[in-house]
UniProtKB/Swiss-Prot annotation:
This is Sugar fermentation stimulation protein homolog. InterPro entries: SfsA, SfsA_C, SfsA_N. The gene is sfsA. It comes from Gloeobacter violaceus (strain ATCC 29082 / PCC 7421). CDD domains: SfsA-like_bacterial. Belongs to the SfsA family. It holds the Pfam family SfsA_N. Coiled coil: none annotated.
């Protein structure tokens, strides 16, 4: 297992409320109630259970409106990452350290490169050895037992990204979708067909056209994030 990210000292608390998408009310261990920034604007299905232990980071910037940021939540003994700003940073570190063998060989890593016919930006473009690889990253927290699911709601943006990647594949360009499984208890991945059937259809169409799908497992702890390898893919 490769440690790809280390947290600064975090503050433990209990989740009391999530509201207006961007805010979480957390009771600290000393009983103080604080409002933390919620860096995940999605529905957070099943990962915002009130009364669950959480960890917050604290900004040293005195000018910041909210000092605390919600980083993770403990669900039945598994820490689940909440901060959606972290996955791309961690994947970049993984690419620099070349721990994801499935992406092949490359010399340069470019970020946020414009591409496609729908005004998109690819998260990572790997070039320099062999064919370039366009790599998109999606964070997933929803699960059914040990099965990770994406998406957790209808995502027109996610559908657009799949269409763009499919067009690349149809023109002979290598493209990949990396699902950042933001919890260590999942060993398999499946599209969330019941929540966004069109997304599942597009993902299957992409695979048929050569899209590389990488469901990458990560273990989240209050100390660090570790890469655990890839999960199996279930499409039935």
């Amino acid at each position: 297992m490769s440690v790809l990210f280390e947290y600064p000292p975090l503050v433990r608390g209990i989740l009391r409320r999530r509201y207006k998408r961007f805010f979480a009310e957390v009771e600290l261990e000393d009983g103080q109630l604080v409002t933390a920034h919620c860096p995940n604007t999605g529905p957070m299905r099943a990962i915002s259970t009130l009364g669950s232990p959480v960890y917050l980071s604290r900004s040293p910037d005195p000018a910041r409106k909210l000092a605390y940021t919600w980083e993770m939540i403990d669900l039945d003994g598994t820490w689940v990452g909440v901060n959606t700003a972290l996955p791309n940073r961690i994947v970049y570190r993984a690419l620099v350290e070349r721990v994801i063998a499935e992406v092949g060989t490359y010399r340069t890593i470019r970020r946020e490169v414009p591409y496609g016919s729908e005004n998109s930006r690819i998260d990572f473009l790997l070039t320099g050895e062999g064919e370039p690889l366009y790599l998109e990253v999606k964070s997933t927290t929803l699960n059914q037992g040990t099965l990770a699911l994406f998406p957790d709601t209808v995502t027109t943006r996610g559908q657009k990204h799949l269409r763009e990647l499919i067009r690349l594949c149809e023109h002979g360009t290598r493209a990949a979708m990396l699902y950042f499984i933001n919890r260590g208890d999942c060993t398999a991945f499946s599209p969330g067909d019941s929540l966004d059937p069109l997304y599942g259809q597009l993902l299957r169409a992409g695979i048929e056209r050569g899209l590389l799908v990488l469901p990458c497992r990560f273990e989240i702890t209050p100390q660090s994030v570790r890469y655990l390898g890839t999960a199996s893919i279930l499409l039935a």
